[in-house]
Amino acid sequence: MTDYDVVIVGGGAAGLMCAMEAGKRGRRVVVIEKGKVPAGKIRISGGGRCNFTNIHCTPNHFHSENKHFAKSALKRYGPNDFISLVENHDIAYHEKTLGQLFCDNSAQDIIKMLLDECEAVGVVVKTSMTVEHIDKNETFNVLTSDGMISASSLVIASGGPSIPKMGATGWGYDVARQFKLKIVDPVPALVPLTFGEAFIFDFRALSGLAVDIRVQCGKTSFDEALLFTHRGMSGPAILQISSYWRSGMDITINLAPNRNVFEELKIQKEHQPKQEIQTTLSGIIPKRLALYLCDHSGVSGTLADLSHKKLKIIADLVNVWRITPNGTEGFATAEVTRGGVSTSELSSKTMEANKVPGLYFIGEVVDVTGHLGGFNFQWAWSSGHAAGQFV
């Protein structure tokens, strides 16, 4: 049996951050990673350049059953703290849009930074190793594929089941259940939405088309880009709203935000009555989409031929298009997982399980889900840092 102070299961963003922070405190730390190399999701994120944080990050950018849970960790270790770390390692970066920070070169820069920090404080990182069993007496005994490891603190940083091709599973939830902790049902988040067969047939004609929209589900809305795909809808707007969508709910799409299309059509009818409705709409939204909506609504002809009632029908499809998804593309393409270990079971200051001293949960395995744009990485850094001060 090998003894450490801290065993961290999961060598991703949260796990490595926790490891280096615990190591700075003189703790003997081992990270167990089942993959051949650590930080797999960092490597593929942001098109290989890693959207490592967002300078506008606040607790309001996170979804959880307890909307206040993330406040403590984010306050103690925020975007500026991680940016300072990046700058100390001379990693070049840039702001792409909406506060999203990316590496100029490669996500590998972030991975090397984390591993260098871990190495500097004596953290041991073991790859291609799986956990077979865990039990707790005075310490945690972790049976791995390479023998038994004992430690006073056990950190679960194994993520959620999103992107299973990277080896992602819901293993961390099994550990939580073993210790009688509540789980908020995990579902795919930041994921494309799908529609019925009739819609799929229609959407194929729009595949590849992108348009800036406002999308709303319930009381939540986002102004971002929509991308039509051969399977349904994707793009930042849809990925964002997917975290708030539930089965059976409508989403409302405004294809021309900040424009009153009905009023514009009435004015255009007065000035150019012989203009075809498709032509008029093509001046407001992309032509392919204008043709689709006219076909979809059965509204066609010149503006002079169309009553205000008909104009209102087509205008509402532009400004208030209500549509009901029949599902999502699932964990296979989901960027993150919504749900996880209930925050009611954890200390927001330390990430320690209230009922199991020495057991910690950090990162995606916890019921804290960020918006698209670097927020989930910031939660990984913040929660990992928080636990690293106490393990």
Where are these regions (language model features)?
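Short hydrophobic core segments
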Residues: V7-V9, V131, I149-K165, A176, ...
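Glycine-rich FAD pyrophosphate-binding loop
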Residues: G23-G47
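Feature captures the FAD/FMN-dependent oxidoreductase FAD-binding
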Residues: R76-S153
